[in-house]
Amino acid sequence: MLAKRIIPCLDVRDGRVVKGINFEGLRDAGSILEQARFYNNEMADELVFLDISASIESRRTTLEEVLKVSGEVFIPLTVGGGISSVERARDAFLHGADKVSVNTAAVNDPVLISRIAERFGSQAVVVAIDVKKVNGEYIVHTHSGKTPTQYEALEWAHRVQELGAGEILLTSMDRDGTQEGYDNEILKRISTSVHIPVIASGGAGNLEHLYEGFTKGHADAALAASIFHFRTYSIREAKEYLRDKGIAVRL
């Protein structure tokens, strides 16, 4: 059985780590470098760096910060926010990213997924899908959750897989920052219908939520921010809890 991954996420804005609720009401969550070092030493399996205002402001990811983080961590680093072209993906890789995460740009130009995958390999392409329930349907949103699209979540997940995505980062906007648990309904629906790994995101508030993301949502990895940034739990605590409940993790 493949080990399940625990992935902390650094949502970055104006040079600081931030965290909000339902993609709004951001509060400061510390220094980028301090958090990155902490997670590297804490046995995180990977680290995600998301410049959350890059797509809204139509600019590239803050590559200087990416370079600093990549010099401090020795775990796979995924970089997202403002990755709107093959050239910007290349720049992220040159600054130390192991994977890039595309979201808004992929919806606007789906072939971008294929172009990045052909150049750098599918394993380096994560497609972030932000979903919100609208009239009973899970609708994909872009621009940090501000813009609804015409895509239903499952339909888009299948499309990005066909285009060459190596992984899906699925975030429930309704659950984001609420600490009420992942939306395991849509998580299971997508995880069981695609053959690429799916990362659960949005809503982890305790260790049981991580467990449920794996058992009820069938996720391959669990991403969390609040519970780790504010030291409610450590990565080691999370992994030991999961191991004791029969989930394969790296310790």
UniProtKB/Swiss-Prot annotation:
GO terms for molecular function: imidazoleglycerol-phosphate synthase activity; lyase activity. Pathway: Amino-acid biosynthesis; L-histidine biosynthesis; L-histidine from 5-phospho-alpha-D-ribose 1-diphosphate: step 5/9. The active site is at D11, D130. It is an enzyme of class 4 (lyase). It comes from the Bacteria. Its EC number is 4.3.2.10. IGPS catalyzes the conversion of PRFAR and glutamine to IGP, AICAR and glutamate. The HisF subunit catalyzes the cyclization activity that produces IGP and AICAR from PRFAR using the ammonia provided by the HisH subunit. Heterodimer of HisH and HisF. Belongs to the HisA/HisF family. This is Imidazole glycerol phosphate synthase subunit HisF. It comes from Chlorobaculum parvum (strain DSM 263 / NCIMB 8327).
